[in-house]
Swiss-Prot record:
GO terms for biological process: one-carbon metabolic process; S-adenosylmethionine biosynthetic process. One of its GO terms (molecular function) is ATP binding. Mg(2+) binds at D18. Keywords: ATP-binding, Cytoplasm, Magnesium, Metal-binding, Nucleotide-binding, One-carbon metabolism, Potassium, Transferase. Catalyzes the formation of S-adenosylmethionine (AdoMet) from methionine and ATP. The overall synthetic reaction is composed of two sequential steps, AdoMet formation and the subsequent tripolyphosphate hydrolysis which occurs prior to release of AdoMet from the enzyme. Pathway: Amino-acid biosynthesis; S-adenosyl-L-methionine biosynthesis; S-adenosyl-L-methionine from L-methionine: step 1/1. This is S-adenosylmethionine synthase. Belongs to the AdoMet synthase family. Its EC number is 2.5.1.6. It comes from Coxiella burnetii (strain CbuK_Q154) (Coxiella burnetii (strain Q154)).
Length: 393
C-alpha cells in the first residue's frame, strides 16, 4: 500500500531583510576573525528603511570599520538605488558594541585548545538523508535553488525588472518516504513597477522554476503560485524590518529535522550554537554517506565552560543498518565533539562565514564548507562491518 504525504520548505533570497541582517553580522565576523582568529564575536543587526543598527559583544585585538562593512554588504546585495527605499550609500549606520562578559571569558578562554569550554549551554541538531545528491531534504534544497536562480537572473541582467527581495516555497509529494512530484511551488519576487503581472508570471515559471525543478516532478497537477498578492514592488527593509537570526529553519533543514533554537550568523565558532550544529551535520552526513542509515538526526548538547558534550543522541527513523546504540559508540570513537577539536577539525578560524549567510548552511559544495566533507564515511562503514556504500560527495 502506498503511503502518500506532503512536505513543505521555504527559502528566502539574499535581499530578504532578515538575510540582509545575517549577511551584515557575518561580514563583521569575517573581517575580525581574518585578523584575530581568537576573537570573540556576537554581532547582531537590525535593518529597517533607511537605517542599520549593529550591536553586540566583541572582544578582539583586531579592528574593523563596521560602518563601511555594513554599507558594502548592503550594496553588494543590490540595494544601491535610492528609489528602492534602502540604499547602502545613504542609509544611517548606528553601532552599539560592548565586550564579552568576563564571567563567560572565565569558562571559555585561557585553556588548551582541546579543552576550550563551550561558549554557552545549548542543544544542536544535525541531519542528513539520501533524498538528494547533497544528502539534504529535497524541499529545502530546491527552495534554495529557486531563490538562488532569482538572484542570478537579477544580477546578470536577464530579467532586469527583478529586485533583491524574494521568497520561495516548495511542497513535494512523498510516496513511501521518497519525493515523487511537486505539488505546489510558490515564488514571490520583488519587481519594478512597470512589469505586468502576466509577463512576470510567465518569466518566473519559464526562467526560474522550470530550469531548477526536476522535470519529472512537474505535471498537470503542479500548482505554480507566482506573487500571489499580485504586486510586490515595496520590499526589502522598506517593507519589513530585518533581524539577525530570524531564519533558522531556512538556514538548516527546512523543518525536516529538529532545531535547538540558536542561530548561526554573527557568532564566532566558540559559540556551539554554530560550531556544534556544523559538527552535528558533519557526523550525520558521514553516517548516511557511509551507509549506516538512509536518514540520520544527531543531537548534541553542551554546558557553558565545559568542553565535553553533556549528551549525544542518534535517531535513524527506522532506516539504520546497525543498531543506534552501536552508531552512538562509533560517533564517540571517530568524532571528537569538544568545541576546540571541532574548530580544529573543521578549520573554522577563517573568514568563511558571510558565504553561509544565504542559501543555507548545509548541502553546499563550496570548499570552505568543511562540515560537508564525507571523509569519515568509509571509516565508519568499515567499523560497522558493512558492505561498500555509494558515497557521492
Amino acid at each position: 500500500m502506498t503511503h502518500t504525504t506532503l512536505f513543505t520548505s521555504e527559502s528566502v533570497s539574499e535581499g530578504h531583510p532578515d538575510k540582509v541582517a545575517d549577511q551584515i553580522s557575518d561580514a563583521v565576523l569575517d573581517a575580525l576573525i581574518g585578523q584575530d582568529p581568537n576573537c570573540r564575536v556576537a554581532c547582531e543587526a537590525v535593518v529597517k528603511s533607511g537605517m542599520v543598527f549593529v550591536a553586540g559583544e566583541i572582544t578582539t585585538n583586531a579592528w574593523a570599520d563596521v560602518e563601511q562593512i555594513t554599507r558594502n554588504t548592503v550594496l553588494q546585495i543590490g540595494y544601491n538605488d535610492p528609489h528602492l527605499g534602502f540604499d547602502g550609500e545613504a542609509c544611517a549606520v548606528v553601532t552599539a558594541i560592548g565586550k564579552q562578559s568576563p564571567d563567560i571569558v572565565m569558562g571559555v578562554d585561557g585553556r588548551e585548545d582541546q579543552e576550550l569550554g563551550a561558549g554557552d549551554q545549548g542543544l544542536m541538531f544535525g541531519y542528513a538523508s539520501r533524498e538528494t545528491d547533497v544528502f539534504m531534504p529535497a524541499p529545502i534544497t530546491y527552495a534554495h535553488r529557486l531563490v538562488r536562480q532569482q538572484a542570478l537572473l537579477r544580477k546578470n541582467g536577464r530579467l532586469p525588472w527583478l529586485r533583491p527581495d524574494a521568497k520561495s516555497q516548495v511542497t513535494l509529494r512523498y510516496e513511501n518516504g521518497k519525493p515523487v512530484a511537486a505539488d505546489c511551488i510558490v515564488l514571490s519576487t520583488q519587481h519594478s513597477p512597470e512589469i505586468s503581472q502576466e509577463s512576470l508570471r510567465e518569466a518566473v515559471i519559464d526562467e526560474i522554476i522550470k530550469p531548477i525543478m526536476p522535470p519529472h516532478w512537474l505535471d498537470k497537477h503542479t500548482r505554480f503560485l507566482v506573487n500571489p498578492t499580485g504586486r510586490f514592488v515595496i520590499g526589502g527593509p522598506v517593507g519589513d524590518c530585518g533581524l539577525t537570526g530570524r531564519k533558522i529553519i531556512v538556514d538548516t533543514y527546512g523543518g525536516m529535522a529538529r532545531h535547538g533554537g540558536g542561530c548561526f550568523s554573527g557568532k564566532d565558532p566558540s559559540k556551539v550554537d554554530r560550531s556544534g550544529a556544523y559538527a552535528a551535520r558533519y557526523v550525520a552526513k558521514n553516517i548516511v554517506a557511509g551507509g549506516l542509515a538512509d536518514r540520520c538526526e544527531i543531537q548534541v548538547s553542551y554546558a557553558i565552560g565545559v568542553a565535553e558534550p553533556t549528551s549525544i543522541s542518534v535517531e535513524t527513523f527506522g532506516t539504520g543498518k546497525i543498531d543506534e546504540v552501536r552508531i552512538q559508540q562509533l560517533i564517540k570513537e571517530h568524532f571528537d565533539l569538544r568545541p576546540g577539536k571541532i574548530i580544529e577539525e573543521l578549520n573554522l578560524l577563517r573568514s568563511i562565514y558571510k558565504a553561509t549567510a544565504t542559501y543555507g548552511h548545509f548541502g553546499r559544495e563550496e570548499p570552505e564548507f568543511t562540515w560537508e566533507r564525507t571523509d569519515k564515511a568509509e571509516i565508519l562503514r568499515e567499523a560497522a562491518g558493512l558492505a561498500a556504500a555509494n558515497v557521492t560527495n
